[in-house]
Amino acid sequence: MAHKYQYTCEGTIRIKREDEDFTTFVYVETNLYEATIQEATEWFEGMLSKYAACYGIDSKFSQVGFEVTSVQQKD
């Protein structure tokens, strides 16, 4: 079994309602234990996309998107 490192992952989910002029940002931070930074980034990106999809099924939101902003290995 490969050694797993701890990574701190940060990202945002952008949501906008149809009748509003501004975008709301949801900040997400978590710690993951993965073998490589690529695996941590892919896992976190998948998690953010699923979380954003929850907003996407609500018809009140006209625009939904997400972005991984940081993945860093902790010491």
Place the predicted regions along the sequence by residue.
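A short, charged, amphipathic alpha-helix used as a generic interaction element across diverse proteins
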Residues: 33-58
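Short, mixed-charge low-complexity intrinsically disordered segments
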Residues: 49-75
